[in-house]
């Protein structure tokens, strides 16, 4: 059985900012980005240990077609999505929670 995905408030903020940015760039691009994020959540949920570590217990998964990674931590009963990070930003932000 797959663990549930929980999304931190910071990750939700990251997601909304990215969707808003892409919607300004091109109509419908924000929806495409959100679809790719949801696909990546599904991959994380199915195989949480398949991704590489960024720091201690934090793993990351690359989002297809966009310059983003999702950082997460596999906990006992759930998978916590920590950040949805634009890879063009400061690398130190990856470790913020």
What is the predicted role of each segment?
Residues 39, 46-78:
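Basic/aromatic recognition patch in beta-strand/loop cores that engages polyanionic ligands
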Residues 16-19, 38-45:
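Structural signal for well-ordered, non-membrane alpha-helices
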Residues 27, 42, 46-49, 89:
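Generic structural signal for secondary-structure transition and capping sites
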Residues 69, 73-97:
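Enriched for short, Lys/Arg-rich terminal
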Residues 30-32, 52-55, 89-95:
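Solvent-exposed interaction patches of small proteins and small membrane subunits
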Residues 1-34:
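Arg/Lys-rich, positively charged N-terminal/basic patches that mediate binding to nucleic acids
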């Amino acid at each position: 059985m797959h663990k549930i995905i929980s999304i931190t408030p910071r990750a939700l903020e990251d997601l909304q900012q990215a969707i808003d940015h892409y919607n300004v760039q091109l109509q419908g691009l924000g929806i495409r980005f959100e679809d790719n994020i949801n696909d990546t959540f599904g991959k994380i949920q199915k195989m949480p240990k398949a991704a590489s570590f960024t720091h201690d217990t934090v793993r990351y998964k690359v989002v297809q077609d966009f310059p983003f990674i999702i950082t997460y931590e596999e906990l006992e009963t759930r998978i916590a999505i920590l950040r949805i990070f634009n890879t063009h930003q400061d690398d130190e932000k990856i470790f913020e929670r």
